[in-house]
């Protein structure tokens, strides 16, 4: 649908409302509608940050008699994918439907208009972090990355053995804002090494610093510890501490880890030791870590590191051949995929994928399929964190020749589990 407010005609006629592009001067009512749909107040500094990050030209609204009934936004990201490339990716967010618009096709119309726009714009991938998990599968999004939440009894856990040379790591607690450039330089080096990470650009580097008092829940302001080796920044951790006292006047504080990164295992071990040994605390909560978190192989007693695995990043292939050619493959693959995609018919059909560690070619074909799946399942497999074998076990992928599941699983695999370090869904911003 064009930005002129012309009626959307996909599916049944809907004469009472239409989908429009957001006029540049309408950000405030648009965002107010988003807040209303999420049923929660928001600190002024959070609203201000979203105002600076928002891209009104990429936002859509559904209006009925002038009132906003539905919203959808898109952020311009660059995401790391298997092979180390960082590619243009549409970050879908601020999707909402007011109560009066439910069961009337509003969400479907927004998703339809948005996907058509993404295709015209040339982004091969769209991603989102869902506030409600069941919503987006019917629009072609598949769960591609999970996150690990750790609840650690820190008085019962120590690093099993210091990493060799860890005593050579220098630690210093620094102001998070003043240390931002150093942290971002390190993050940029790590970005290509793990699929699913977004480049911190256009103000997104400020999201980890977001720390409104109303969201602290008794914690002190966020702090930052920097790890240095041989005069360079080798790691950092941002965290907050909430100290509580028991009835026996014993300190039972909690360290809440916002993020912790390092490019050297010695620096990583030193940072975790610092966190685990924080005075006046007995608990460490790390709500968003990769599922292949190295800490679990460092600690003396993993049973006191209680894990919870959650869904995180959902991936949608907007343009199948461009998306599959953007990444590389861990082992050689030559296969025909039969992909179902009713919501994006340009993706529907059979595709021959030939690829290896250097690159890939993906073209339409009439050859018999080796694998049949829908586009959401392909999105789940894209970053290498969900295998074709497990999707087949769930009935999401069907193999038509022996051995192809093992071949596809190996080819699409990633050395590091995909992970999204920060949420860009408004309701999932860090509340530590």
Spell out what each predicted region is.
Residues 1-28, 82, 164-432:
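Intrinsically disordered, low-complexity, positively biased terminal segments
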Residues 22-26, 34, 105:
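Hydrophobic, small-residue-rich alpha-helical packing segments that form membrane-like cores
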Residues 37-81, 85, 196-224, 323-324:
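Active-site rim helix/loop that mediates acceptor-substrate recognition in acyltransferases
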Residues 94-97, 102-119, 264-276:
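Conserved acetyl-CoA-binding loop-helix of GNAT-fold acetyltransferases
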């Amino acid at each position: 649908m064009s930005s002129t407010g012309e009626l959307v005609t996909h599916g049944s006629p809907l004469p009472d409302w239409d989908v429009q592009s957001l006029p540049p001067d309408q950000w405030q009512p648009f965002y107010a509608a988003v807040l209303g749909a999420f049923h929660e107040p928001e600190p002024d500094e959070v609203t201000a940050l979203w105002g600076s990050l928002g891209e009104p030209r990429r936002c859509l609204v559904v209006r009925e008699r002038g009132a906003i009934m539905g919203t959808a936004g898109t952020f311009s990201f660059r995401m790391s994918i298997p092979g180390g490339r960082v590619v243009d990716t549409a970050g879908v967010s601020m999707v909402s439907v007011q109560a009066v618009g439910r069961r009337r096709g509003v969400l479907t119309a927004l998703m339809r208009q948005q996907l058509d726009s993404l295709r015209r714009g040339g982004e091969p991938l769209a991603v989102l972090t869902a506030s409600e998990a069941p919503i987006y599968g019917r629009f072609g999004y598949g769960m591609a990355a999970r996150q690990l939440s750790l609840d650690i009894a820190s008085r019962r856990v120590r690093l099993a053995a210091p990493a060799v040379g860890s005593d050579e790591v220098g630690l210093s607690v620094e102001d998070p804002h003043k240390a931002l450039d150093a942290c971002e330089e390190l993050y940029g080096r790590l970005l290509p090494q793990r699929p699913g990470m977004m480049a911190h650009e256009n103000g997104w580097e400020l999201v980890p610093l977001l720390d409104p008092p109303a969201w602290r829940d008794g914690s002190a302001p966020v702090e930052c510890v920097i790890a240095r080796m041989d005069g360079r920044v080798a790691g950092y951790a941002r965290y907050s501490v909430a100290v509580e006292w028991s009835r026996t006047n014993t300190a039972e504080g909690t360290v809440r880890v916002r993020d912790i990164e390092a490019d050297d295992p010695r620096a990583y071990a030193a940072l975790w030791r610092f966190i685990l040994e924080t005075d006046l605390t007995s608990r460490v909560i790390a709500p968003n870590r990769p599922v292949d978190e190295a800490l679990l192989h460092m600690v003396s007693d993993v049973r006191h590191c209680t894990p919870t695995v959650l869904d995180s990043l959902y991936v949608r292939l907007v343009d199948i051949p461009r998306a599959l050619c953007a990444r590389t493959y861990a082992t050689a693959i030559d296969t025909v995929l039969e992909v179902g995609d009713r919501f994006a018919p340009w993706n529907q059909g059979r595709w021959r994928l030939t690829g290896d560690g250097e690159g890939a070619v993906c073209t339409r074909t009439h050859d018999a399929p080796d694998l049949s799946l829908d586009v959401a399942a392909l999105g789940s497999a894209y970053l290498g964190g969900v295998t074709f074998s497990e999707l087949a076990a769930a009935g999401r992928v069907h193999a038509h020749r022996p051995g192809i599941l093992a071949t596809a699983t190996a080819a699409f695999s990633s050395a590091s589990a995909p992970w999204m370090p920060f949420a860009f869904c408004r309701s999932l911003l860090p509340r530590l």
